[in-house]
Amino acid sequence: MTARPLRRARRDVGAAPFIVIWEATRACPLACLHCRAEARPDRHPGELSTHEARELMRQVAAFGRPAPLFVITGGDPFERPDLFDLVRYGRELGLAPSVSPSATPALTPANLSRLHEAGAAAISLSVDAATAARHDEFRGYDGVFSRTLAAWRAARQAGLKVQINTTVTRRNLSQLPDIARLVRDHGAMLWSVFFLVPTGRGRALAALSPQEAEDVLHFVHDLGTVVPVKTTEAHHFRRVAVQRLILAERGADHAAELGLGPLYRDLRRRARRAGLIRERRARRPPVDVNAGRGLVFVSHTGSVHPSGFLPVACGDVRERPLTEIYRNAPLFRALRDPGRLSGRCGACEFRAVCGGSRSRAYACTGDVFAEEPWCGYQPGSFPYQRELTPYLPQEEARER
């Protein structure tokens, strides 16, 4: 074995999450087509108060060192007047808060500077097309694209790291090479390519076929030679990374061996023409987290979920500590056991490094342990099974 294609968590994800996402509010003036939260213009009266939000952050810090990543999302977090104070308090606790704002008029250079001064480590911005017309249509308002690009520049000038999020749907597949070029040219610490989960307003958007998803995953892997990129709710990207490393070591044609389609070939051709692909090893995918396995989501009203895209409440931070819910809630414990998976995911040799999107499985079937709907891989079909052994971890014993 000459390289490790995957990063491994340096913590016991049964004891502490890698990332905690807090939905600070659902208030947001935009009307994005894919919005998980189905955001509303006004704040909900049952949102966590400032005092309760501080207590939540103390609970996050109680997971110990290294502290989980702590992301404040929405709606639009700028709808909360206590946002800067909460970021500052999180920093005092030893957290490194990141903020995921919407591209509203509140996203000004002054507010971005205040976020940095309060102690925010990074922000994430959404770019779902490479042109103003296409992006603004997706977001529901004119001017959002130009405001996003201006905020991108202002955030970097203020000293904030910037992550760019892109939701992949049938509407913007052809835009992916151009969005990648924006990420390269403007600079970002990470490009997060999110595979749509049909929740909230996103239920109305057309799903990718498994073949299209596979083509996009391999295209994203190719971009990793130039652009720092990861996937969200596309856990089979880790399978792709293992397959591609083994095929590269054998000098095999990955497109032919894996039956990649015309979408992949078109995206790759356009990206190569733009200088977005080089003949060198791609960056490894970030640490694997999945719903309830390294990831926990706290809603605006305090309910705790394995993911923001898996709407099954497992407790409430107003009633039980977050540490207790994450470690002991039956669904969280079950989600950390690959042996609970069914269908092709349950039979797959990659299940311990992938596991499929539990959120998408639930959204499409009502069964959180069902097979990943956007994965077309047939277990056992990879032709070099013997070479897989060093890359696939031994599965942990089931949590009792």
Language-model region placement:
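Radical SAM enzyme [4Fe-4S]-AdoMet core and its adjacent flexible, acidic
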Residues: 43-44, 116-118, 126-128, 133-290
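Accessory C-terminal segments flanking Radical SAM cores
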Residues: 236-380
